[in-house]
């Protein structure tokens, strides 16, 4: 059995038009280690679980838990990436589907299908290996039935049967799989910005203030992992 976690990201101010959906697939036997990796990253930086940790707070010390510095947030994100999608520690299969045309309802559903179908390996033939449970972040503009239909289409294309229905959640630290999907989607935007939009990576930092050399070095390492890790795939742009 596998679990799939879905979240999306965008930043219309600094990366105009970019919209991405990330799907993270985890074998049930590896889920607990993924959860522990996310929990450890949050514990190590002292993050208060009353505040949501997500991609958009990584570069801002005034969002979320304000007692945690930008450097500590970057360390937490770096730790999550290293423990889940790096070549040495790959415990998930992740796909980021994206467009530069913005995130309308139609685009969102198409990106969900792309990301989910790409992150899942073909279903195994042993008993229970063809089952998948899917958890997705709530998005007000998307009707639950439309999301469910899109996901059923995606998992069926890889030979899976959906357990019950899609579980739609409100993001929080209590949903580490969805949290990880959000962080990876945002870091995917960071990677996109570095290749396509001159100066836009730095603009993602709060106030557009250039971070320390140490933070930039760590983010460079994160980008290298995302671009080289076999566990993460960037789906060709949706046009």
Which positions does each model-derived feature cover?
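Phosphate-ester processing/binding pockets and catalytic centers
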Residues: 1-239
